[in-house]
Amino acid sequence: MNLNNNDFITIGNKDESDLIIIWFHGYGSNNWSFEPTLKVINMQMNEAAYIIMPNAPLVNDKRSWYPLPTKDENNQLLEDYQGLQASVHAIDNFIDGLNLDVDMKLIIGGFSQGAALALSMSFSSRHKICGCAALSGYMPCAKIYEKHDISVMDIFMSHGYEDKAIEYDAFQKSLKFLENKTDNIITSVGNFGHTINQQVVNDLASWFGQRIK
């Protein structure tokens, strides 16, 4: 992944925060897409977080964190694990360049493809991460990660019953997979599509806040 390490936006005050959050947007979107929501969440947390939102590189005129899955001639899903790992490595290098306080708690999170990236980093990032928030996403390359230990034990997941982009069944399979890796999973689900609602916002803000304590 050819990531521009200077292309990111932030919320909050780095020097006055108790928590660092790195947030990954969805496929075809950009880092401004969740900025309003994350501002509201940080307000609910009394501005306790410093939030960093990088931009995925453009691939065929759409921003993408890693190679999208394809299907073979038998309609079987093909996932590019090496491409995904290259993206995780690029994000690790991005985090290195931020020169963050190593004593600060670090959370990763994202929406849709960004959520999938965050979940994969929960297994393979070289950084110490205390939590992962995955909204409307899925567990990529689960067959390979089945052989790996998870390093991030606290996970927040949300999904809508009516999601057509990443169907609820994919969430259920991902949740079942992750429950075999950790007992510390909080979920927030409801009657919505490939988006989030106010309940998810409130639940996520509460979960973030608990990571500070």
Please place each PLM-identified region on the residue numbering.
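Conserved alpha/beta-hydrolase "acid-adjacent" motif
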Residues: 32, 164-170
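Short beta-strand immediately N-terminal to the catalytic nucleophile in serine-hydrolase-like folds
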Residues: 108-110, 135
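C-terminal catalytic histidine-bearing segment of alpha/beta-hydrolase fold enzymes
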Residues: 156, 169-213
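Short beta-strand/loop motif that positions the catalytic acidic residue
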Residues: 156-159, 163
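A conserved short beta-strand
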Residues: 127-139
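Gly/Ala-rich beta-loop-alpha elbow adjacent to hydrolase catalytic centers
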Residues: 110-114, 118
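Serine-hydrolase catalytic machinery in alpha/beta-hydrolase-like enzymes
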Residues: 2-104
